[in-house]
Amino acid sequence: MAKISMINRDLKRKRLAKKFADKRLSLKKVISSDASSYEEKIEASCKLQKLPRDSSPTRLRNRCEISGRPRGVYCKFGLGRNKLREAAMRGDVPGLRKASW
């Protein structure tokens, strides 16, 4: 089980990334646009730098929804490998079964 503070920190980052996503996208469009002047690009990059650091989606970490484990997380299910295995063995995940060859 991950520390509660780490889980809460990641949740805070998700909220901030969602809150500033539109603003961040519009500033990045101005920076990468050929139609923008040099001054507009500089101004947009300054505004982008002044956004909260945790609002960047790069700082997000995929965590298991149940245990908060940061590694070995399957994006499709949102669960860590251990919890996914437990859920599959209980039959909670439809269509998922143990591999056999």
UniProtKB/Swiss-Prot annotation:
GO molecular function terms listed in the Swiss-Prot or TrEMBL record: rRNA binding; structural constituent of ribosome
Record keywords: Ribonucleoprotein, Ribosomal protein, RNA-binding, rRNA-binding
Record-linked InterPro entries: Ribosomal_uS14 (IPR001209), Ribosomal_uS14_bac/plastid (IPR023036)
UniProt GO BP: translation
Domain of life of the organism encoding this protein: Bacteria
Gene Ontology cellular component terms for the protein in this record: cytoplasm; small ribosomal subunit
Physiological role: Binds 16S rRNA, required for the assembly of 30S particles and may also be responsible for determining the conformation of the 16S rRNA at the A site.
HAMAP family xref list: Ribosomal_uS14_1
Family: Belongs to the universal ribosomal protein uS14 family.
Oligomeric form and interacting partners: Part of the 30S ribosomal subunit. Contacts proteins S3 and S10.
Name of the protein in question: Small ribosomal subunit protein uS14
Species of provenance: Xylella fastidiosa (strain 9a5c)
Lineage, opening ranks: Bacteria, Pseudomonadati, Pseudomonadota, Gammaproteobacteria, Lysobacterales
Gene: rpsN
